[in-house]
From Swiss-Prot:
Keywords of the record: Cell cycle, Cell division, Centromere, Chromosome, Coiled coil, Kinetochore, Mitosis, Nucleus
Record function comment: Acts as a component of the essential kinetochore-associated NDC80 complex, which is required for chromosome segregation and spindle checkpoint activity. Required for kinetochore integrity and the organization of stable microtubule binding sites in the outer plate of the kinetochore. The NDC80 complex synergistically enhances the affinity of the SKA1 complex for microtubules and may allow the NDC80 complex to track depolymerizing microtubules. May play a role in chromosome congression and may be essential for the end-on attachment of the kinetochores to spindle microtubules.
GO molecular function, one term: cyclin binding
GO cellular component terms, A-Z: centrosome; cytosol; kinetochore; Ndc80 complex; nuclear speck
Coiled-coil regions listed in the entry: 265-427, 464-573
One GO BP annotation of this record: skeletal muscle satellite cell proliferation
Family according to the record: Belongs to the NDC80/HEC1 family.
Localization in the cell: Nucleus; Chromosome, Centromere, Kinetochore
The protein's assembly and partners: Component of the NDC80 complex, which is composed of at least NDC80/HEC1 and CDCA1. Interacts with CENPH.
Listed name of the protein: Kinetochore protein NDC80 homolog
Chain intervals for the UniProt region annotation (Disordered): 1-47
Biased composition annotated in UniProt, kind: Low complexity: 1-16
Comp. bias intervals (Polar residues): 22-33
Length: 640
C-alpha cells in the first residue's frame, strides 16, 4: 500500500488562506445523507476522465495529501465570493471528453431520443431541456419542468443541488453557442456525477458510514481510513478557529502513521537519499531537455536514417545471397570439372607411366628421339597457346561479369526510380487509386534470360497510354474550365467597377443633400435669432412706453399683441418648414443609405462567392502537376 507522498513534508507552513469565510448558507455543508435530493458537491465518480488526475474535482475540493500540504477551505463557497472554475473549459479535448461521457450516460440509461456525439456538439434549447429533465428525473422522479421561465428554473435547480458555479439566464437561451456550451455540458456532467453518487449511496449505504475503515487508495495515493479522516477534521476545525500552525497534529498523525505502517527509522534516511538522487536525475534530464529542445526530432531523423540504412543493407544482403547462390552453382560445376580433370590427369599419369615403362624397356634410334622431341616441342607450343587463350578467355569472362554487374545495378536503379515514381503517382500496388486494376510493378529476374523484361512492354504500355490519354483529356477540360472562369471573373470585375461608380455617385448626392440640410438649418437658426432680437427690441420699447406715456398704453399693448401674434405665426411657419425639410432630408438619407447598404451587401456576397469559386478552382488547378505527370509517363513509355 502506498503512502502519501507529502506526509513527511514541512510541518511549519503558514496558511495560504487570506480569509476565513463564515457562510450563513448551509447548503454547502450538507452531507449526502441529509435528503434524497441532497447536496452532492462536486464529486466526480466517472472513471472515464482523462489521465491527468489534477483535473478531477473531489467532493469537498482537493484533499490535503499530507501533514505539511496546503489545505484550502471550500466551505462557504456559496457566499458572495465568486469561485473560479478550475476545470479546463477552454480545452477542446476536455469538452469532447465531457460530450462523449454525456452521450454514453444517455445511451446506457435508456434515453428515449436519438443522440450522438455529433448532435451534442451544438444542441438546441429543446434538446438541452429534454436532456436536463431526463437526468434530473433520476434524482427526483416526480419533478416536471415548467413550460415557462425554464431559464430561471434550471439555474435554481443547480443552485439547490449545490453546483458551485453560477449559470446565467442568458446562457439558457444560447445553449449551443461556442462560448456557452462548455459551461452547460460541464454542469450536465456534474449532474450525472451527482446521480452516480446517489445511486452508489442507495446500493451500498454502509460504505458511507463514519465507522467504516476504508482500505483502498485513490488515484493520488491517499489511503482512505479513519485515521486520515480524523486528522483532516481536526486540522480543519483548528483552521476555522484561527490556527495557522499544525505541529502538534502533524506529530500526532506521524506517530500514528508510523505505528500503522510499521515504519523503520533506518529506512527513512535511505529513502531520503534515493529521493534526492531522483530529484537530481530529474533536474539533469530537465537541463538536457532545455539544452537540446529538438533532440527528439533529431533522434527521430537518426532513427529514420538508420531504418533506411537497414533497408538498404537488407536489400544488399538479399543481392549477396542471390549472388552467393549463383557462385555456389558455378563452384559446384567447377568442382565437377575439377574432378573430371583430376580423373583425366590420373588416367594421363597412368598412360605416361605405361609409356615411360615402354620407353625404358625399348631402344630408340636418333631419328625416333628427334621425332619425339619435335612432337614434344609442338605439344609444348600448343599448350602455351592454349594457356594464353585460356587467360584471355578468363580476362574476358571477368570483364563480362563486371559489365553484367554494372548493367544489373543500373537496371535495378532504374526500376527503383520507376517504382518510386509509380508509387508517387498512385499506380502501384494494384489496389492504388490510379492503377485501375492494372499491375504496373516490374519484377526483375536476371536468371530468366535477356528477354525477362519483354513481357512488361505489352503489360504496362497499353494501360499506361490509356491513363496518359485520360490525363490529357482532364487537362484539356481543366484548361477550358479555367478559361471560362477567367471570363466570368472579368465580367464580375466589370460589374463590380460599375456598381462602385454608382455607389460613389450616390454618396456624392448624399453629401450634397446633407450640405443642403445643414444650410437650411443654419438659415432657420439665423431667422430665429433675428426674431428674438426684434422681440427684445419690442420689449424695450414697451418698457419705455410704459414708463413715459400712460395715455397710449392700450394702443401700445394692442400693437404689442399684434406683433407677438405675427412672431408666433412666423415662428410656427419657420418651425414647420424646418421640420418638413428635416423629415424630407432624413427620408432621403434613409433611402440612399438603404440602397447603398444593399448594393454593398450584394457586392460583398458576389465578391465572396467569386473568391470561393476562384479558390476552389485554384485548389483543383493541377495543370502543372498533370503536365509533369504526362511528361514522365511519356518518357517512361518511350524508355520501355
Amino acid at each position: 500500500m502506498r503512502r502519501s507522498s507529502t506526509t513527511s513534508g514541512s510541518s511549519g507552513r503558514q496558511s495560504t488562506m487570506v480569509l476565513r469565510v463564515q457562510d450563513s448558507n448551509k447548503m454547502g455543508l450538507q452531507t449526502p445523507q441529509t435528503k434524497d435530493r441532497g447536496t452532492f458537491g462536486k464529486l466526480s465518480m466517472s472513471k472515464t476522465t482523462s489521465a491527468t488526475s489534477e483535473r478531477k474535482v473531489s467532493f469537498f475540493g482537493k484533499r490535503a495529501s499530507g501533514a505539511g500540504g496546503s489545505r484550502n477551505s471550500q466551505y462557504g463557497m456559496f457566499g458572495t465570493e465568486k469561485i473560479k472554475d478550475p476545470r479546463p473549459l477552454h480545452d477542446k479535448a476536455f469538452i469532447q471528453q465531457c460530450i462523449k461521457q454525456l452521450c454514453e450516460f444517455l445511451v446506457e440509461n435508456g434515453y428515449a431520443h436519438n443522440v450522438t456525439i455529433k448532435s451534442l456538439q451544438s444542441p438546441s434549447v429543446k434538446d438541452f431541456i429534454k436532456i436536463f429533465t431526463f437526468i434530473y428525473g433520476f434524482l427526483c422522479p416526480s419533478y416536471e419542468l415548467p413550460d415557462s421561465k425554464f431559464e430561471e428554473e434550471i439555474p435554481r435547480v443547480f443552485k439547490e443541488l449545490g453546483y458551485p458555479f453560477p449559470l446565467s439566464k442568458s446562457s439558457m437561451y444560447t445553449v449551443g453557442a461556442p462560448h456557452t456550451w462548455p459551461q452547460i455540458v460541464a454542469a450536465l456532467i456534474w449532474l450525472t456525477d451527482c446521480f452516480k453518487l446517489y445511486a452508489a449511496m442507495r446500493e451500498n449505504p454502509s460504505s458511507f458510514d463514519d465507522g467504516q475503515n476504508w482500505g483502498g487508495e485513490t488515484d493520488d495515493g491517499i489511503v482512505h481510513n479513519k485515521l486520515f479522516m480524523d486528522y483532516v477534521v481536526k486540522c480543519y476545525e483548528h483552521f476555522m478557529k484561527g490556527g495557522d500552525t499544525y505541529e502538534e497534529l502533524d506529530a500526532e498523525v506521524q506517530s500514528k502513521l508510523k505505528d500503522l505502517f510499521n515504519v523503520d527509522e533506518f529506512k527513512i534516511e535511505g529513502l531520503a537519499a534515493e529521493n534526492k538522487r531522483l530529484h537530481e536525475e530529474i533536474a539533469r534530464l530537465e537541463k538536457e531537455r532545455e539544452s537540446e529542445p529538438d533532440r527528439l526530432v533529431s533522434l527521430r531523423k537518426l532513427r529514420s536514417s538508420f531504418q533506411a540504412d537497414v533497408q538498404k543493407y537488407q536489400a544488399y544482403l538479399a543481392n549477396l545471397e542471390s549472388h552467393t547462390t549463383i557462385l555456389d552453382q558455378k563452384m559446384k560445376s567447377v568442382n565437377e570439372e575439377v574432378e573430371t580433370t583430376e580423373m583425366e590427369v590420373e588416367a594421363m599419369k597412368q598412360e605416361n607411366a605405361r609409356l615411360q615403362h615402354i620407353f625404358d624397356n625399348q631402344k630408340y634410334s636418333v631419328a625416333d628421339i628427334e621425332r619425339i622431341n619435335h612432337e614434344r616441342n609442338e605439344l609444348q607450343q600448343t599448350i602455351n597457346k592454349l594457356t594464353k587463350e585460356l587467360e584471355a578467355e578468363e580476362h574476358q569472362l571477368w570483364n563480362e561479369e563486371l559489365k553484367y554487374a554494372r548493367n544489373k545495378e543500373a537496371i535495378e536503379t532504374q526500376l527503383a526510380e520507376y517504382h518510386k515514381l509509380a508509387r508517387k503517382l498512385k499506380l502501384i500496388p494494384i489496389s492504388a487509386e490510379n492503377s485501375k486494376g492494372h499491375d504496373f510493378e516490374i519484377h526483375f529476374n536476371p536468371e530468366a534470360g535477356p528477354n525477362c523484361l519483354v513481357k512488361y512492354r505489352t503489360q504496362i504500355k497499353a494501360p499506361l497510354m490509356e491513363i496518359v490519354n485520360q490525363t490529357e483529356e482532364e487537362i484539356r477540360k481543366a484548361t477550358q474550365r479555367k478559361m471560362s472562369l477567367e471570363d466570368t471573373l472579368e465580367q464580375v470585375n466589370a460589374m463590380v467597377a460599375e456598381k462602385k461608380s454608382s455607389v460613389k455617385t450616390l454618396k456624392e448626392e448624399a453629401e450634397k443633400l446633407d450640405d443642403l440640410y445643414h444650410q437650411k438649418l443654419k438659415e432657420a437658426e439665423e431667422e430665429e435669432q433675428k426674431c428674438a432680437n426684434e422681440l427684445e427690441l419690442l420689449e424695450k420699447h414697451k418698457q419705455l412706453l410704459e414708463s413715459g406715456v400712460n395715455e397710449g398704453l392700450s394702443e401700445a399693448t394692442n400693437e404689442l399683441h399684434d406683433i407677438q401674434r405675427q412672431y408666433q405665426i412666423v415662428m410656427q411657419t419657420t418651425t414647420e418648414e424646418s421640420r418638413k425639410a428635416g423629415d424630407n432630408l432624413n427620408r432621403l438619407l434613409e433611402v440612399i443609405t438603404t440602397h447603398v447598404v444593399s448594393i454593398e451587401k450584394y457586392l460583398d456576397e458576389q465578391n465572396s462567392k467569386i473568391d470561393r469559386d476562384y479558390e476552389e478552382f485554384m485548389s483543383e488547378d493541377l495543370l502543372s502537376t498533370l503536365t509533369g505527370i504526362l511528361d514522365s509517363y511519356k518518357k517512361k513509355a518511350e524508355s520501355i
